[in-house]
Design a protein with these regions (language model features):
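Ligand-binding beta-strand-loop-alpha-helix segment within the catalytic cores
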Residues: 147-177
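Conserved beta-strand scaffold positions in the cores of enzyme catalytic domains, especially
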Residues: 66-67, 143-145, 154
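Contiguous, glycine/small-aliphatic-enriched amphipathic segments in soluble metabolic enzymes
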Residues: 1-130, 173-247
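FAD-binding core/adjacent interface of flavoenzyme oxidoreductases
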Residues: 135-149
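A generic structural signal for well-ordered coil/turn residues at beta-strand boundaries
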Residues: 61, 142, 150-153, 193
Length: 248
């Protein structure tokens, strides 16, 4: 569900009101039953919430929506759109439950609704976002964030950091890792035999040979060349205003 005070419940309700999701899978909402009921009522959707307990098989008909609430105590009253420890903590519990169900084979995949990073930190969960939390919960040796839109798939070298800190955080090893994970995802998850990976520059005009910064020559180009040597079809650093058109 994401943060109950956020847009997650609304997005989920509207998605489940259509037929596309049901054609793809048997959806299970992990979140607050009362929040889903209030959201559906406010949106005037023809959906009925069916509370689910434990790991029992779910049988749904028509416009039924299965909701599993892992919270031991009901959520206190909260204000929509306002960060709070209670809702932040709840969103973390929802994620933990989803990961557990996936690990024991009860569900095949997880789709996350937005969390509020301020709220989860207020609740004592000091993660900058979903990616880092999921990696920790699954004891992943490596992880990365890839966003997908149409034919474009973007893998990040850094996540959830201030722009002023980017230069000092970029290393050749981190860039090589991102390129390698992108290649693994494209070949393994998407079945693309020989994916082309455009490596983005950091500075305007790819640094213009050091005129606008040296990160390209110092770490990005060496990482790209090392990846090329391993057989990955990675480009040399490309300016941001060019890379999308060139590699779609």
């Amino acid at each position: 569900m994401g943060d109950p005070a956020g847009i997650g419940p609304e997005v989920i309700a509207k998605a489940l009101a259509g037929r596309e999701v049901q054609r793809l899978c048997l959806p299970l909402v992990i979140g607050s039953v009362p929040v889903m009921e209030r959201t559906i009522k406010a949106l005037r959707l023809k959906l009925t919430v069916v509370p689910v307990h434990g790991h029992d098989p779910v049988s749904l008909k028509g416009n039924m929506v299965a909701v599993l609430d892992p919270m031991e105590t009901p959520l206190k009253k909260f204000k929509p759109g306002v960060a709070a420890a209670d809702t932040g903590g709840a969103s973390v519990e929802f994620i933990k439950k989803a990961v557990h169900l996936a690990e024991i084979g009860c569900i095949d995949g997880i789709v996350t609704a937005p969390i509020n990073k301020e709220a989860i930190n207020m609740a004592g969960c000091h993660y900058p976002g979903h990616t880092e939390l999921l990696a920790d919960l699954t004891n992943a040796k490596e992880s990365g964030m890839m966003i997908v839109g149409g034919p474009l798939r973007i893998m990040f070298v850094t996540t959830h950091v201030a722009i002023k800190d980017l230069s000092k955080l970029l290393t050749q090893a981190k860039i090589e890792k991102a390129i390698r994970l992108a290649h693994q995802a494209l070949t393994g998850l998407y079945g693309i035999k020989k994916p082309r990976i455009g490596v983005a520059a950091l500075n305007p005009h790819a640094g213009e040979h050091g005129l606008f910064g040296n990160e390209e020559a110092r770490v990005i180009l060496p990482a790209a060349r090392a990846s090329q040597a391993r057989g990955i079809l990675a480009s040399d650093p490309q300016p941001a205003d060019k890379i999308g058109r060139a590699h779609v």
